[in-house]
Design a protein with these regions (language model features):
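Conserved ATP-binding N-box helix of the HATPase_c
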Residues: 3-26, 85
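Glycine-centered, small-residue-biased loops immediately flanking beta-strands
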Residues: 27-29, 88-89
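Short beta-strand/loop element within the Bergerat-fold HATPase_c
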Residues: 28-40
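Glycine-rich/acidic phosphate-handling loop/turn and adjacent ATP-lid/helix
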Residues: 40-73, 115-118
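C-terminal beta-strand of the catalytic ATP-binding
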Residues: 48, 104-110, 117
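Glycine-rich nucleotide-binding loop
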Residues: 73, 96-103
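Conserved glycine-/histidine-rich ATP-lid loop and adjacent helix of the Bergerat-fold HATPase_c
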Residues: 78-88
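Glycine-rich ATP-binding loops of the HATPase_c
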Residues: 87-96
């Protein structure tokens, strides 16, 4: 993934998390970045409080679906569009009525036989 694409995804997910948490009595956003050497991946987790009734979970990644006024937000649709280009990157979304979690998993590319140097 190109750095500008990662930056765009990070910005969208953080903006959404902050915006959702601001509407809650308990305002909480947690960001975690870690490396999983066993599965050879980097993981970005963004978790926030949210108001359950404002989120259309079934359609949230579709173009034109937004919690913003007049459905002006394109953020998650744009995230989805970027992610479709990278089979080694997954976004897992979960919610429990109090916390909304986005977990971005970026797996290392495995070099093909042609790329492996021969001594």
């Amino acid at each position: 993934m190109k750095i500008y694409e990662f930056s765009r995804i990070l910005g969208i997910l953080l903006d959404n998390a902050i915006e959702a948490a601001r509407e809650c009595e308990e305002k909480m956003v947690r960001v975690e970045i870690r490396k999983d050497s066993i599965q050879n991946r980097q993981i970005l987790v963004i978790e926030n409080t949210y108001l359950d009734e404002k989120v259309d979970f079934e359609h949230m990644f579709e173009k034109g679906v937004s919690s913003k006024k007049h459905n002006t937000g394109l953020g998650l649709w744009e995230v989805n569009k970027i992610l479709k280009k990278y089979p080694n990157v997954n976004l897992n979304t979960s919610h429990d009525g109090h916390f909304f979690t986005q977990q971005l998993e970026m797996y290392e590319d495995v070099p093909s036989q042609k790329e492996i140097p021969v001594p």
